[in-house]
Amino acid sequence: MMNRLLVFLMLGAFMLVVSANDAYGDEPAFKDLNQGDESLGKRKSCCPCWLRGNCFWGQNCYPEGCSGPKV
């Protein structure tokens, strides 16, 4: 029973991190979309640098979420 509870809690924590990462990256993209910025496609494939450069799926690391210069 404890193993199932532990797995459930770990999955919940993982989903929370994934959703927080999505929310962090969406705001600049919507702002750029409203301003007609054509770099929207580039900014969809990025991650914040507080992940210490451990970006997934070949994403680029940006210090300010998706809006800063690439690191």
Curated annotation (Swiss-Prot):
Domain of life: Eukaryota
Chain positions listed as propeptide in the UniProt record: 21-41
Keywords for this protein: Disulfide bond, Ion channel impairing toxin, Nematocyst, Neurotoxin, Secreted, Signal, Toxin, Voltage-gated sodium channel impairing toxin
Function of the protein: Voltage-gated sodium channel (Nav) inhibitor. 1 uM completely inhibits insect voltage-gated sodium channel inactivation (DmNav1 from D.melanogaster).
Pfam families, alphabetized: ATX_III
Disulfide bonds: C46-C61, C47-C55, C49-C66
Organism of this sequence: Anemonia viridis
Major site of localization recorded for this protein: secreted
The keyword Cell membrane is assigned to this record: no
GO cellular component terms attached to this protein's record: extracellular region; nematocyst
Assigned protein family: Belongs to the sea anemone short toxin (type III) family.
GO molecular function: sodium channel inhibitor activity; toxin activity
Keyword Transmembrane: no
Subcellular location: Secreted; Nematocyst
Signal peptide annotation: 1-20
The organism's taxonomic lineage, starting at the top: Eukaryota, Metazoa, Cnidaria, Anthozoa, Hexacorallia
InterPro entries in alphabetical order: Neurotoxin_3_Anemonia, Neurotoxin_3_sf
Listed name of the protein: Delta-actitoxin-Avd2b 4
